Amino acid sequence: MKECVICGRPNSEEHHVIYRSECRALIKCKKNLVYLCADHHRGLYGPHGKCGKELNRKLKLEFQNWLEETFNKDFYSIEEIKGKLGISTNAVKSLSKLIRQKNSVFDREDIIIACMGGKRIL
């Protein structure tokens, strides 16, 4: 049973920090998923709620920080990206289409931006 990361309530819902519409390649990435109760997921102040920008930003910033810690070298191969994100071969190929390739490797910054749906949280 999964508990809400905000309040600890059981029977929580899966929430994609980076929405599927922002980066489909991360649909199955475990680090892109958090569990939120119905109130914190779809309620007024939840990421899908009318006033949920603050929580949405907080969750995205936490994910971005994880990406920065995880991708700590300058360049990565497609296999390294796949391993670090824990995603399928097809998903990493899809992600790689969003990133400029330099001599068969991908730049750390470009990987992070692609994983964040094209924009960094400042």
Question: Could you say what each language-model-derived stretch is?
Answer:
Residues 1-13, 37-39:
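Short cysteine-rich loop/turn motifs with clustered Cys
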